[in-house]
A protein has these predicted regions:
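Intrinsically disordered, metal-sensing/regulatory segments
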Residues: 1-259
């Protein structure tokens, strides 16, 4: 039980660590560092989606022959569609822009930025929950060590994400503690989402291949719709490409070595 609780909380600790950068770094993050971190986060999320979610989803349906890919394909598309719907309905603001997206709202920029990060973190929490549910069920090739590897990978990805949230908020005039708290709270949805998936695991077990792919699709949506455009826009895009490669390889190694 303690291993499970620790696994669910590790990603939140990564967000808190990144948010704490606001205490010992200058108020504004350099464009070079921000591009590198965005690319790194993208690489980790893509690798986790492929190695820890999509491949296990297809392996669970190996007895279906050529149709083994069907649950993974359906779940992936549903995951992307779900995040697209949430993105359209929820008022939010992306980093580096003053143009709100989603439904019209009178929320402050700080609140809309926090909502954007919550949308981002939701699929990551689902991914952690579903891999732990898969490891606990014994119905997949996902081991407990493999589930912890996913949790660690997302935590590593959350370190730059926490910094990318807290430091611009500090630069906008918020206090260091307020910037740290909002950055940290943006990651609270991850353990909550993971816990909900695990609590419902017994009911959802027949649909586990779909859920694994659903989480992968949702994570891919965040990467394609948010992270890659922000990483590629403007100067220093080569740094984001290098960061992507490093993040992808790191997550791949974690999954293979620990899985």
């Amino acid at each position: 039980m303690m291993t499970l609780i620790t696994g669910l909380l590790i990603p939140l600790l990564g967000t808190m660590l990144g948010s704490a950068f606001v205490f010992f770094m200058k108020d504004e993050m350099s464009p070079r560092l921000q591009k590198s971190l965005l690319g790194f986060a993208s690489g980790v999320m893509v690798a986790a989606s492929v190695w820890s979610l999509l491949i296990p989803a297809m392996e669970m349906e190996a007895d279906s022959g050529k149709w083994a890919v069907a649950p993974a394909a359906i779940g992936f598309l549903l995951g992307m569609g779900f995040l697209l719907l949430i993105d359209e309905l929820t008022p939010h603001l992306h980093i580096g822009t003053d143009k709100p997206e989603g439904m019209r709202s009178h929320l402050s920029k700080t609140a809309m930025l926090a909502l954007a990060v919550t949308i981002h973190n939701l699929p990551e929490g689902m991914a952690v929950g579903v891999v732990f549910a898969g490891a606990d069920s014994g119905a997949t090739n996902i081991s407990l060590a493999g589930a912890i590897a996913v949790s660690l990978g997302i935590a590593i990805q959350n370190v730059p994400e926490g910094a990318i949230i807290s430091m611009p908020m500090r630069a906008a005039g918020n206090s260091r503690w307020r910037s740290f708290m909002i950055g940290s709270l943006s990651g609270a949805v991850e353990p909550l989402g993971a816990a909900c998936v695990i609590l419902l695991a017994s009911l959802l077990m027949p649909a586990l291949p779909y859920l694994l792919a659903f989480a992968a699709g949702a994570m891919f949506y965040v990467v394609v719709e948010e992270l890659i455009p922000e990483a590629s826009n403007g100067q220093h895009s080569n740094l984001s490409t290098i960061g992507f490669a490093v993040g992808f390889v790191l997550m791949m190694v974690l999954d293979v070595v620990m899985g």
